Amino acid sequence: MKMFQSFFSNYIDINFFRNATLDQCLLLFYLSLFSLTNLFLIQKLFHANHTQHPLKKYFGETCLLEYIQIILSIVSAALSFYLDTNAVWWAIRTITHLEIVGLNILSSLKYGSTLFSWISVANAFGLLLLRLISIYDFLTYSSWSFSVKGGSFLLLLPLAYNITLFLLVIIPLFFPRAWSPTVKFSKVARPSPEQTCSIFSLIFTYGWLNGIIWKSWKKPITLTDVPALPDTECTQIWYSRFAKNDRKSLMHTILLSLKSTILLMVFLSVLVSSTLFVTPLAIKKLLQYLQNPKSDEGNSPFLWVFVLLIGPYLASVVKELYVHVSRRFMLRIKAAITQMIYKKVLTSKTLFVAVDGSKINLDYVYNLLAKDVDNIGEMREFIGIIARAPLEMGVSMYFLYQLLGWSAYVGLLLAILSSSFPLLVASKISRLTSIANTSSDERIRLTTELLKSIKITKLFGWERPMLSRIQEKRSFEVNNMYSLTLFDIIFKSGMKIAPFISMFITFAIYTKIMGHQLTPATAFTSISMFGLLRYQFIWLASVSRQFIQFKVSLKRVDNFVYGNMVNDSSIESSDSFVFENTSLSWSPTPSTALFQLKNLNFTIPRNQFTLVVGSTGSGKSTLAMALLGELHVISGKMTTPSISQRIAYVPQAAWLRNGTIRSNILFGEPYDEERYFQIIKACCLDSDLNSMNDGDLTYIHSNGSSLSGGQKQRVSLARALYSNAEVYIFDDIFSALDVSTSRKIYESCFLSTLLQHKTIILFTHNVSLCLPIAENVIVLKNSTAQLVSPDSIQELVPSTFFSSNTKKDNIEEENLEPHSFSFDSTLASSSDNDEQRDFASNSSIVLLGLHYLKYFGSNKYILGSILLVMMSQVSLASIHFWIALWSGNSLFSLKLPSSFSFLWGYAILLFIYFLMDLSRAITFAKGGRTASENIHDILSERVLYSPLHWFEKTAAGRILNRFSKDMYATDNLLWASLEGMLLCVMAILITMLNVTLVMPIFMVPAAFVSLLVYLHGYAYSKAQKQLTSLQSSRTSPVFTMLGETLGGITVIRAFKKEKIFEHENMAFIDDMIQPLYISFAINRWLAIRTDGISGLVGFSTGLIALLRQNIPPGLVGFSLNSAIGFNISVLVFVRANNEILTYINNFRRLYEYMLLPSEKNESSCLTKPMNKEWPTLGHVSIKNLTVSYSIGQAAVLEDINLEILPKEKIAIVGRTGSGKSTMGLTLLRFTMIMSGAVEVDGIDINSLDLEVLRQRISLIPQDPVLISGTVRSNLDPFEEYGDGELNEILKTASCESLVQASNKNSLDAFAIHLDTPVDSGGVNFSSGQRQILALARALVRKSRIVILDESTASVDDTTDRRIQQMLRAAFKHATVLCIAHRIKTIVDYDKVLVLDSGKTVEFGSPKSLYTQRRAFWKMCKESHISL
């Protein structure tokens, strides 16, 4: 009763009311009610604003409820002035009410009600501050007394006033807030609940996330279920701000653009540091009271127990608010810099040739987005540590000095020395990190290239050597990672032990030299302070490594974004293309150029048809790039059409986007139905679209992989024609079309009104088709160009350009055969469905964990690792327990050792802890290394030996994600998270055991808290898993967009569609940020609840100790210290458990690939011994052959019977989908033989080892693939031949003119030798040169059986004739099967096989089949060939 009396006498301030008259008291109470009513009216007002209240049309922008608010505010003001009194507290209350009234009116009339909630909160906390004085007086009692003069009425009235005032403080915190879009261009169609929730939900509970938590508990969520991204976080806002504050330095740009956010983070960091000392102070005060209850009668111990309850929660509120703001800071950086990188891609020269001449690998750009952008975002950690570390260290040392006197200076000295340790090892960490990153990038680069060239790898049977190359890179990478990990472990262990050493030396000086008694209050408060220091040192150690990575990433991104800023001042604008003594190069510095066009002097007339011709490798495509402004002007002057003239460009290799055929043709232009179908017909697409189920709405994947080469080219042509541009540049558009389609397109496009009065520049080999309408001709030769009239062209170019056979006499435009292999999609793309699959179930998680441990080490090794975790945690707890015994020595009845013995015991325990902790970390790191090696070896082997059709249906980006993102998580994070979770489990168990031994009743609150934390953790985990999955699925489009842009950058810039692509990319970034933002936010949701719930543990421990007077203070301190650690361990355990689930999911995806069916497992037992030189004859016998691509699918070849004699030259022809390419693949066992057999020199190919089979039979594909390295490594990857032999093969493969080239710097005269560098994919060679090198590669093998799949499609007719002659001479002793698309190339073959729908139609010599006047005769007639 006395406590309640004291409460009323202190809290209600009854003495102030005693001097007031009754009417003044009533009016003040009435004033408070008006203020409270005013708040409720504002709440109604919010809903009126949000739903566009109908009364607004009568009252304008200010609705009726706002008028009511203003009237009530005036009444409140009048009532406040009536309360005229000289009392100071009455004046303060009146001023406070006037402030509320004035701000209410101001917010209503000028700023709108959106601001009101924040104003109310500010005033509410001001009023709350007045109340805290009385609350503190109550809790820090000296005596309980109560006396009221004036009766019970004067008691009830102020009580009602204070209740009203309390509600005035609380209610604004629960009001929802009004929302209006921040920017007009915001994509957000709905407000984020974060922007409309109450202040209480926003800051104190993160209750605005309850909806997504509940949805994820009930069902799988989709992106539409995720709360909208606040429109204040949209990419366009922050990209625009970065662009506005651009200082050509990324660091300066970030600081200027986010300065307000940085200042807020610094302010919150200071608050976080301040709240950290509340709990240690409460422990100290409580222990002092327990040591001597009569020492300070002015303080209530219940206050400090209450602080143990509320202190961790308030500290958590401030800390999580800081983390939330810092995560916003990070995501704003991620969004803006990602867009900056994309904008740089859009504005960089083709091939990304840097100023120094070096080429930036495209994988480099992907790494910038995947790693470096996130590393830069982690600068939030540096802001936090810069603001917090000095303050926390300084305050910790001040408290330590207050506790331990001058001995604390020793600890300060050690702290300074320890804090400088990261600086001393920074260079070492930087070097190791750089080496590890470089080795990882090299492995990813090699893996990427392998995926790009997987078809040629499997065709040539190169799996084993390619696997050896990858494993060699992998071994180097793992060794570097392990070295870095070991150094990091030793470094962090030293940083962790430093505060313990400092504590040991400080206690030794305090007790042995200064002669003081170490009391529990002093000891355990010091432990808390040293714990804060220890945390700072660990943080410094962690951040120092992050800082190194940050600097490296910042430099890389800065160099990319602001590097290569070359402005060609020599390029001017006019009405047409003009070259005046112009020299052009891919590089801005001519000394580093691989190729140049020199001394160009000509003008391309406007609105005329100009034909550009030249031999293979003469530089036609290079000139096309020059016209588009993609080359650098080295000397002279170049003039291009003004920006008002639109340019339409059709590249030689068609570029299409993910989307429908219609969207690819429209390409951002408005839909005009009449013109659209006119273009469709002109491009001969009408029949193709009619054959598709969805017509022009058929969805095509990246680069149109589901379309044939001719279809892709015609869609690309339709896109150009639909744009209705002023200038058209066509780069060899007829090479992918058959003769009939070429003629139709020539007539419907070039001879129609579609291209009338347009500037047309056509690069082509098909001179005879287009010359009749050409008004000008540009002839490319010897790295220069000459503009001539059509009449004089025959004097400058070979006569073969005009021969009757120069037409492309393709049998028919080749569609992709059913299930044929196509692997030209971008490596950045991956299936959303794959990434968005549900995480593994709980049971499968356990199984996956056990599978991982199988690769981690033996059972004994795993058991030893777990024991080391337990021993390290036990040794850590033993240190604190030893200090408890030491500090409570005088309070125990037992005979305990002297203080000197305690010091030695402390030192021994310290050494044991260091040894156990170091051993535990090294053991787990070594196990993680073993697991990484084993997993990658199995993964790479399984993927490399997978059937070719698996690569067809599996996106290349998905495979690359396994070897990069998922492998990185397994290499570095999975074992570390497993270790961290085990540490948390042991810490929780040991904490509960420690406190329970001292206070058995502690098990009750501990069990209750554990249950609550488990339920919250389970809800959190379900939501986090699904958000992580969504995040993965929404990240892929950003990389896919980048890949698409890189593939079609010249097309995008030519059509001037950069703005469309920029906005589309920003939309993708917003979609990527949305689940990531919520994912970070629900971490705050969990942390603030876990801290609040776990605060019950410290509160329960303190309350039990206070109520039970028989527990020694030393053990109470030990229990409290353990209980506070329990809070942290519980939260870390929940997060570690979620991390384990995430990283186990990464391992699950790897494990799925580790179980792929392997071609290597197929039978390789020979039915009879095989000659090492097999096949010696090249005799092929096919008997009753029926094949399909996989089990359960329809047959693609049926009942084929052939007898191919040694050295015979067989041509395989047929219409689209007839099975020509399938026949070639069957000989190499890329299909499944359902019945029949194929024998080579009498041996069934099913009985042969696949690698042997594919190494002995050569298939030259239509699409030549070169691997980075040199010409030598491409011809002879296993180094089996000498230079002399390889040079002879180069000459034989029609490359003699290239090998014997002069020093002229031209592409057709550029000296190719064995050491000539080859870029990835051979991009530094023309398509014709790549095809010639691919032919030379086949010649090196000297195979007895050679399969040619239209291997001359990318060369001009002159080169084609030379290659055909070379093939006849080089393979005269070999059996040749030519899959032909041009009749003219096979008329002199021994036999022709005509296929139709997978069946044999005709088989015999060309002349005999021609005389039969059947299928082959019709093909010859269509190609205008007579035999």
Curated annotation (Swiss-Prot):
GO terms for biological process: transmembrane transport. GO terms for molecular function: ABC-type transporter activity; ATP binding; ATP hydrolysis activity; ATPase-coupled transmembrane transporter activity. Residues 579-807, 1180-1422 form the ABC transporter domain. It is found in: Membrane. It is a multi-pass membrane protein. The chain crosses the membrane at residues 26-46, 63-83, 87-107, 115-135, 155-175, 197-217, 262-282, 298-318, 345-367, 397-417, 489-509, 513-533, 609-629, 760-780, 866-886, 896-916, 973-993, 995-1015, 1086-1106, 1114-1134, 1223-1243. Residues 262-549, 862-1142 form the ABC transmembrane type-1 domain. Glycans are attached at residues 49, 437, 567, 581, 601, 658, 703, 782, 842, 994, 1161, 1184, 1324. ATP 1 binds at residues 614-621. GO terms for cellular component: endoplasmic reticulum; membrane. Pfam families: ABC_membrane, ABC_tran. Keywords: ATP-binding, Glycoprotein, Membrane, Nucleotide-binding, Repeat, Transmembrane, Transmembrane helix, Transport. Its main location: membrane. ATP 2 binds at residues 1214-1221. Belongs to the ABC transporter superfamily. ABCC family. Conjugate transporter (TC 3.A.1.208) subfamily. This is ATP-binding cassette transporter abc1. It comes from Schizosaccharomyces pombe (strain 972 / ATCC 24843) (Fission yeast).
